């Protein structure tokens, strides 16, 4: 939406002399002055660091300050300032989000929000992490939005901590082109092109193309990778009330599978960060993904509109890898497992939403009634050696590569089919200027069919399982706008997530169930330049799979966990020249019931304290006019390094990054980013003491950006 102001000035109206008034037959009219500004849309660009609208929390275009829930938005400008090729660094500024298993560096397989790990994240409201999709590329991302607390009432199956929704770049009315090329430490090279143009004079047909090409060796020995991304999109205003948006993305990714470093005797730091424990001649894992998405919107009138959207993705991953398995008693001989993977998956999702904007007396209702259907197929083949028979060991102090490959002793083949249907009902209620409410519920029907075959040491075993789960996940929230600058809110909601497999009796497990409670305050500071959200939360999860003590080798749904604490996120302009984004979180997350893990054990990779701050100053005068200079600080507290909280932990760390941009010409900008300025040795994440991901040493990136 555009906002226009036209001014017509009559000179004669400003004259007080009757004689002069009589001499003027008509007022003199100056040229019409039109001031045009682009109003923010929930799926559109953000000016600076502060977003004011979102669709992630309600599936409607709503002001963030009107939603009774904590929402963190990390806009495109942050990704550009960081010069980050992936989105994980943006999540450092969301508050309460930490890193988890990244599947050997190939994917954003799991992450953690408010203490609970999840593998669910979304792309324009569609589940984006079915299968083993490549880690999202920043080239296509307009904003990263983090919805805190259970999101099942809107998105279905998930975990109670929260979820991430990636809002992709959409075609715009303006014609522009942006070419960005960068080169950095360890022979990292990357180029992106963002091209946007109207295809007709009326501006009804718009086209956008995003391209990315990447070749990176990285700081880890032998762990290099290449990526090619092509992402075209086109929007068509069919008539004043109807629009169609079609988006596609093709990714070709080749990368070495790398489980990281190890911690002999549970101690980190004795080995070089660059040391690789796979085999250089294993080659790379190929991960090819295709995504196609279409959205049709139609407005029947001012009150009612319809949204019909469909999303399809396909992926194929295959390749060999030698992976860390376990350390021998001496702490230096690392047993390894040789694996071959061949995975292929298809996922299709269709959504139909009817939206209404009605009044009952003085009360306004924004209604959402939605249907969703998903069909997912996944086929996995894993061949693996058996370390207990063929250790395939390597000395971590003096690794010698090129050993003969051990034979495959185990053959696992899995086939999974999922059919899921859901009904969404939601009412955003405006009782008055000060009071707002939110009611929502989702009804899910989930059916999963699994077939698995295993050949282990010459013995063949086939298992099949089927489960059908039904769940109703409500949420309720209320917001009180105490003053124009202060809003108080509270909410409660539920989540569910199906558990795969069966118990000793062959019965499908009950799904995990979560509950979340949140209360907080939203602040609008410095005349609207800076926004801040502070929220306290209490989350519980039950029916977590744990070992069945009566039947070794089987599981039961007896585990429970709890997370509580508070988090803070702020973003905006401290002054007209200084933009800021920052976050802090205190999280107390622990096991409250488990057959194997002690009560009170910390949850994996969850720091009690974490915080971040980035500030960028824009010069407006002198020879530095148009230049930027900034810094970012990120702190992560110590964390449990394995799921049993056995005493192995990752130490706390603080990193400092610097950035600068200098305009060489009106359309050319030179950029410099220095990451980990003080070269701190740190560890981002772990799964156990032989799967530990070290952080990058100090590194430099130079970039050139051309705008047309």
Swiss-Prot record:
Domain TBDR plug residue range list: 63-169
UniProt membrane topology term: Multi-pass membrane protein
Disruption phenotype: Deletion mutant does not show growth defect in LB medium, but it exhibits an evident growth defect after treatment with AMS.
Induction: Is part of the operon cntOLMI that is negatively regulated by zinc level through the Zur repressor, which leads to transcriptional activation of this operon under zinc depletion. Highly induced in response to airway mucus secretions (AMS) treatment.
One GO CC term, this protein: cell outer membrane
Protein's cellular compartments: Cell outer membrane
Molecular function GO labels: siderophore uptake transmembrane transporter activity; signaling receptor activity
Extent of the signal sequence: 1-21
Record domain TBDR beta-barrel: where: 174-708
Cytoplasm listed as a keyword: no
Keyword Transport among UniProt keywords: yes
Transmembrane spans: none
GO-annotated biological processes: nickel cation transport; siderophore-dependent iron import into cell; zinc ion transport
Family of this protein: Belongs to the TonB-dependent receptor family.
Purpose: Transports the metallophore pseudopaline, which is involved in the acquisition of nickel and zinc, and thus enables bacterial growth inside the host, where metal access is limited. Is probably involved in the import of pseudopaline-metal complexes.
Name recorded for this polypeptide: Metal-pseudopaline receptor CntO
Organism encoding this protein: Pseudomonas aeruginosa (strain ATCC 15692 / DSM 22644 / CIP 104116 / JCM 14847 / LMG 12228 / 1C / PRS 101 / PAO1)
Gene: cntO
């Amino acid at each position: 939406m555009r906002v226009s102001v036209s001014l017509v000035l009559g000179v004669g109206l400003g004259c007080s002399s009757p004689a002069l008034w009589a001499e003027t037959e008509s007022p003199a009219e100056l040229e019409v002055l039109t001031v045009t500004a682009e109003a923010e849309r929930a799926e559109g660009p953000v000016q600076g660091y502060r977003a004011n609208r979102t669709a992630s929390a309600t599936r409607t275009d709503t002001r963030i300050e009107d939603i009774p829930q904590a929402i963190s938005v990390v806009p495109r400008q942050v990704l550009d300032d960081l010069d980050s090729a992936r989105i994980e660094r943006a999540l450092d500024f969301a508050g309460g989000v930490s890193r988890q298993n990244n599947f050997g560096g190939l994917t954003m397989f799991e992450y953690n929000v408010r203490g609970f790990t999840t593998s669910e994240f979304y792309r324009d409201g569609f589940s984006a992490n079915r299968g083993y999709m490549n880690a999202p590329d920043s080239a296509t991302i307009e904003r990263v939005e983090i919805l805190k607390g259970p999101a099942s009432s809107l998105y279905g199956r998930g975990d109670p901590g929260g979820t991430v929704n990636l809002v992709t770049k959409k075609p715009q009315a303006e014609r522009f082109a942006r070419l960005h090329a960068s080169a950095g430490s360890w022979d990292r090279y990357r180029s992106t092109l963002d091209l946007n143009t109207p295809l007709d004079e009326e501006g009804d047909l718009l086209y956008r193309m995003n391209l990315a090409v990447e070749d990176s060796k990285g700081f880890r020995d032998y762990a290099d990778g290449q990526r090619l991304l092509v992402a075209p999109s086109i929007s068509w205003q069919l008539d004043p009330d109807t629009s169609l948006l079609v988006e596609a993305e093709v990714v070709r990714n080749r990368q070495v599978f790398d489980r990281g470093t190890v911690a002999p005797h549970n101690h980190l730091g004795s080995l070089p960060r660059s040391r690789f424990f796979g085999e250089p001649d294993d080659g790379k894992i190929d991960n090819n993904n295709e995504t196609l998405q279409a959205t049709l919107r139609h407005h029947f009138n001012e009150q009612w509109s319809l949204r019909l959207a469909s999303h399809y993705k396909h992926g194929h991953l295959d390749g060999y890898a030698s992976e860390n398995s376990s350390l021998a008693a001496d702490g230096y001989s690392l047993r390894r497992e040789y694996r071959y993977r061949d995975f292929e998956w298809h996922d299709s999702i269709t959504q139909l939403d009817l939206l209404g904007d009605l009044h009952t007396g003085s009360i306004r209702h924004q209604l959402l009634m939605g249907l969703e259907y998903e069909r997912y197929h996944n086929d996995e083949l894993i061949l693996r050696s058996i370390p207990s028979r063929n250790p395939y060991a390597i000395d971590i102090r003096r690794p010698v590569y090129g050993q003969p490959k051990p034979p495959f002793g185990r053959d696992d083949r899995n086939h999974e089919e999922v059919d899921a249907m859901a009904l969404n009902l939601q009412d955003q209620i405006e009782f008055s200027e000060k009071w707002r409410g939110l009611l929502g519920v989702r009804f899910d029907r989930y059916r999963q069919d699994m077939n698995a075959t295993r050949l282990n040491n010459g013995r063949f075993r086939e298992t099949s399982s089927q489960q059908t789960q039904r769940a109703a996940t409500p949420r309720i929230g209320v917001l009180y706008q105490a003053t124009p600058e202060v809003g108080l809110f509270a909410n409660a909601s539920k989540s569910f997530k199906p558990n795969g497999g069966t118990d000793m009796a062959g019965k499908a497990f009950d799904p995990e169930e979560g509950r979340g409670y949140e209360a907080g305050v939203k602040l609008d500071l410095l005349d609207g330049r800076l926004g801040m959200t502070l929220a306290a939360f209490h989350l519980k999860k039950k029916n977590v799979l744990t070992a069945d003590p009566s039947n070794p080798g089987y599981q039961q749904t007896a585990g429970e966990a709890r997370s509580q604490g508070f988090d803070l996120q702020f973003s905006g302009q401290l002054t007209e020249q200084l933009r800021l984004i920052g976050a802090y979180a205190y999280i107390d997350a622990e096991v409250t019931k488990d057959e194997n893990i002690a009560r009170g054990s910390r949850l994996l990779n969850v720091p009690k304290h974490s915080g971040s701050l980035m500030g960028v100053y824009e010069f407006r005068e002198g020879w530095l006019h148009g230049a930027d200079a900034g810094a970012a600080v990120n702190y992560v507290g110590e964390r449990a390094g394995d799921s049993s909280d056995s005493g192995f932990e990752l130490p706390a760390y603080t990193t400092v990054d610097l950035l600068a941009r200098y305009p060489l010409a009106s359309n050319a900008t030179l950029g410099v980013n220095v990451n980990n300025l003080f070269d701190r040795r740190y560890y981002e994440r772990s799964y156990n003491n032989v799967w530990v991901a070290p952080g990058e040493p100090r590194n430099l990136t130079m970039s050139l950006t051309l705008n047309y």
